[in-house]
Amino acid sequence: MRIAFASEDKLGLEGQVSMHFGRCPFYTFLEVENGVVKNWQVMENPYFGNHVPGKVPEFIHSQKADVMIAGGMGPRAIEFFDGYGIEAVTGAFGKIKDVLQAYLRGELRGAGACHHDHPESCRHE
């Protein structure tokens, strides 16, 4: 299984999950087999600072992810991921390695679109 994480940094498993999936600077991709991380890779968000709706889900799909985990994402992004057959998971925070374990234990499932008031700094897909 290939799991993508919205990331604040390039620290891999020690990195922090980003609260805003489409506007994070990096994505961390993990190859997980039988609950064990076999490989990981950090890639820059090619649309960081140049938001185009639907392009980030397309990028994540092109990287062959099965799951996308982030702190939050908007309903349109969730629809794009659904269309690609990628499980969108929200509500994640903290270190990627800890969030991965929570996901594998079944503590994080499905996506809930963000419905809080959006100040200028909080914009979702």
Functional labels for PLM-detected ranges:
Residues 78-84:
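Short Gly/Thr/Asp-enriched flexible loops that form oxyanion-binding sites at enzyme active sites
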Residues 64-67, 86-87:
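Short active-site oxyanion
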Residues 77-78, 96:
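Short, well-ordered alpha-helical microsegments
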Residues 1-51, 55, 59-62, 83, ...:
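Non-catalytic interface/targeting segments
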Residues 70-71:
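Short His-Asn-centered micro-motif
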